[in-house]
Amino acid sequence: MEALVYTFLLISTLGIIFFGIFFREPPRIVK
């Protein structure tokens, strides 16, 4: 069960980082 928690933490952290970068600089891919 610990592996599942660590995996969830890792995915959530990467998601938050990606979210921050995505909103920090505007997406240039419009098409």
UniProtKB/Swiss-Prot annotation:
Biological processes, Gene Ontology terms: photosynthesis
SUPFAM superfamilies: Photosystem II reaction center protein T, PsbT
Its membrane topology: Single-pass membrane protein
Keywords, alphabetical: Chloroplast, Membrane, Photosynthesis, Photosystem II, Plastid, Thylakoid, Transmembrane, Transmembrane helix
UniProt keyword annotation of Chloroplast present: yes
Main subcellular location: plastid
Residue ranges of the TM segments: 3-23
GO cellular component: chloroplast thylakoid membrane; photosystem II reaction center
Pfam family, one: PsbT
Subcellular location per the Swiss-Prot or TrEMBL entry: Plastid, Chloroplast thylakoid membrane
Record flagged with keyword Plastid: yes
Quaternary data: PSII is composed of 1 copy each of membrane proteins PsbA, PsbB, PsbC, PsbD, PsbE, PsbF, PsbH, PsbI, PsbJ, PsbK, PsbL, PsbM, PsbT, PsbY, PsbZ, Psb30/Ycf12, at least 3 peripheral proteins of the oxygen-evolving complex and a large number of cofactors. It forms dimeric complexes.
Family listed: Belongs to the PsbT family.
Free-text function comment from the UniProt entry: Found at the monomer-monomer interface of the photosystem II (PS II) dimer, plays a role in assembly and dimerization of PSII. PSII is a light-driven water plastoquinone oxidoreductase, using light energy to abstract electrons from H(2)O, generating a proton gradient subsequently used for ATP formation.
Protein name: Photosystem II reaction center protein T
Source organism: Nephroselmis olivacea
